[in-house]
Structure formats: C-alpha cells, structure tokens
Amino acid sequence: MGIADFLFGKKKVPGFSSAVYSIDVVMHPFRIAAHKADYAQLDIVVENKFDKELLTSIVITLPKSLGFEQSALSHQKEIRVGGLGPKDKKSIRVQVWGTARTDPGSYEIKLFAMSHYRDYSYVLNEVKKTVELRVA
C-alpha cells in the first residue's frame, strides 16, 4: 500500500480476484462479405468463477461500420443477465451486421462482463475480451 493509497483510502478487497468471469465466444461464420448486408452470429458464454452470486451484465461494443441490426445504427449493446450463481453459465446470441459501407479488413469486437452491486449503476468488477471479425 503506497502513501497515496493510505491518504485517499484505497484498499484491496480480500478474496476478490480480477478473473471473476470466463468469456467464451464462438462466431459463425468467421468472416462476412464486404459492401453487402451480411451478418455473423456471436454465441457468447459467460461463466461466474466467483464463489458467490453476482449481479451480471454484458456490454458489446462494435466499430462504426458494423452494427447490431441490418441498418447498423447501434454500435453498443448492454444485456442485463441478472443474478449469476457460482459456477453458473449464461449463453447469449447476438447478430453483428455489416452494411454497404463496411470495407474489407479486420474489425475488433469488444466484450465486457461486469459484476454490479446494489443495482446496475454501480460496477464492482469487469472482465474484457476482444475478438476479431474478418470482412472480405
């Protein structure tokens, strides 16, 4: 504990590690066609690795040329899972769409699994995973 932590009251929470969740992602197909209305389906499985039930939400962030619907207007999606017990898994399916303005290349999709306390406005911990979608 440093002097700044002592002055400002930052304390380490005992027994709470940073690897609270395990995120597995399967993408079908691995790539989508460029300059066409085409989509890939993400199958996301989140597992609670902690020994207590956690209030859980998942946030998915896409680049500007991809979206969650055919018009690709929304680029971020929050899915409120609810209470996820110890060693429980939750499976979610999401479609990621490319449009006529999607150029060929590799695009990063960011996934965040967050644990909350009280309600969804307070974040206790988060785990991030990045996957790549190829556009050809």
Q: Where in this protein do the model-derived segments appear?
A:
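Low-complexity, acidic Ser/Thr/Pro/Gly-rich terminal tails and inter-domain linkers that flank the onset
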Residues: 3-33, 136
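Short beta-strand and strand-turn-strand segments in soluble, beta-rich domains
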Residues: 22-24, 65-80
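Intrinsically disordered, low-complexity Pro/Gly/Ser/Thr-rich segments with frequent PxxP/GP/PP motifs
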Residues: 74-100
